[in-house]
């Protein structure tokens, strides 16, 4: 998929899909900017924010959003276990239990 085209098309919407397009095109700072304006009580937003923060090397903040995601929807743990990019956050979380 052409993620840069998706960014171009979704940029005006400033929503979850726009953030996902930014992240997929490796525009992580732009993705985080959009996510910062979205609802932190949405587990999908928290999950994506955790992933972007992890990419940016902000592990403590990423862990915070990963745990928040799980608090809102425990099933997201299963999703994270299947996502190689979330491996470090899952491992850190498992070490804390």
Protein language model features and the residues they cover:
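Canonical positions in the second alpha-helix
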Residues: 6, 35-38, 68-69
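Start-of-helix register in tetratricopeptide repeats
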Residues: 13, 44-47, 78-79
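Structural marker of alpha-solenoid helical repeat scaffolds
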Residues: 9-12, 38-41, 72
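Terminal, low-structured helical/coil segments at or just beyond the last alpha-helical repeat
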Residues: 71, 75-97
